[in-house]
Amino acid sequence: MIYLDNAATSFPKPARVVDAMTEFAREIGANPGRSGHRLSVEAGRTIYDAREALASLFKIRDPLRVIFTANATVGLNQALLGLLSAGDRVVTSGMEHNS
């Protein structure tokens, strides 16, 4: 197979990613912050651990400033909405992300 849409879906996923997601789904499977039960708290801890690891990697002082979005389009749009004001103009080319 020749897969030409890697930027959209990151296929194939690295085995470690598949293993971690499978383990989370089998062992925890709860929504973080949705409740106070053990699995919900554990889900929240897992996400916070990921925030800490990314904060360390990118030299971000406060791990709570690391956010997760559904995909690159959502992340880029959120960043732009935080930077732009009404009346601002954005110039792009055909080479930019299509969000």
Residues covered by each model-derived region:
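Pyridoxal 5′-phosphate
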Residues: M1-S99
